[in-house]
Design a protein with these regions (language model features):
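Short Lys/Arg-enriched alpha/beta "domain-start" segment
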Residues: 1-39, 71-72, 80-134
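Charge-rich alpha-helical segments
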Residues: 1-15, 38-40, 56, 65, ...
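Amphipathic, interaction-prone secondary-structure segments
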Residues: 27-55, 137-162
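Intrinsically disordered, low-complexity regulatory segments enriched in Ser/Thr/Pro
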Residues: 48-74, 161-186
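Domain-length accessory/inserted modules outside core catalytic folds
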Residues: 50, 104-108, 112, 116, ...
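Short, charged/polar micro-motifs that form catalytic or ligand-binding hotspots
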Residues: 62, 66, 117, 144, ...
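Ampiphathic alpha-helical segments that act as solvent-exposed interaction surfaces
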Residues: 67-89, 176-203
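Conserved binding-pocket/active-site segment within a compact domain
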Residues: 121-181
Length: 203
């Protein structure tokens, strides 16, 4: 594959190569929510099931819709290669409260929280409608807030506050506490990105 967008394609190519050597049995031992039919893994991400061929990588949406973006595909590859299922203890954490959160908080704020604030805090009703189309669960925080099943046993909440003359719009994303052990900081950033982009696609 010719590398044109290094930022996205180099990581993808790296994990695609690792994926060839992945043992399906080992992946299934770590990830009980993933299914394997001898040819494809089946992974549910934000309510949509993807079939991922192995060992020669290919991805399809089981419902026939378009395939996800390259960063999302990289996230799914990393999930199959590295993630493990960790029990959720019922607590919610901000990005900053998890390991390495303090180190990455500045890029995370710009890439995820500020983007969410100005994408959804300026169109709260559209945000609500999009989340409800996705089957998200309303939560009683912010001017609008919803809870999502991301993948496996990992949950996310997104809360938005509408701006006014005095204050700009604001947003917060909360992660189920198992993210702290089950995902690297980089993947928590990407998870926020994926959630925002998916909600936006329903607006």
């Amino acid at each position: 594959m010719q590398i044109e967008n290094h930022k996205e394609e180099v990581p993808f190519s790296y994990y695609e190569n690792l994926f060839r050597d992945l043992s399906p049995e080992a992946a299934l031992q770590r990830l009980s929510s993933v299914k394997w039919d001898g040819k494809e893994f089946y992974v549910n991400l934000l309510g949509k099931t993807y079939g991922i061929s192995h060992p020669d990588y290919a991805i399809r949406a089981v419902d026939g819709s378009k395939v996800p973006t390259l960063p999302t595909q990289t996230f799914l590859l990393r999930y199959l290669l590295e993630a493990k299922e960790v029990s959720w203890q019922g607590q919610w954490k901000t990005f900053r409260e998890m390991p390495w959160g303090e180190l990455y908080i500045k890029p995370y704020t710009g890439r995820v929280l500020t983007r969410a604030a100005f994408t959804f805090g300026t169109r709260v009703q559209k945000f609500k409608e999009a989340c409800e189309k996705m089957g998200a669960i309303p939560v009683k925080h912010g001017d609008a807030g919803y809870q999502f099943d991301l993948v496996g046993g990992y949950q996310m909440q997104i809360l938005v506050w509408e701006g006014d003359e005095e204050f700009p719009p604001n947003a917060q994303i909360l992660y189920s506490d198992n993210f702290a052990e089950g995902f690297a900081a980089e993947d928590r950033v990407v998870a926020g990105d994926i959630l925002i982009s998916t909600i936006k696609s329903f607006m």
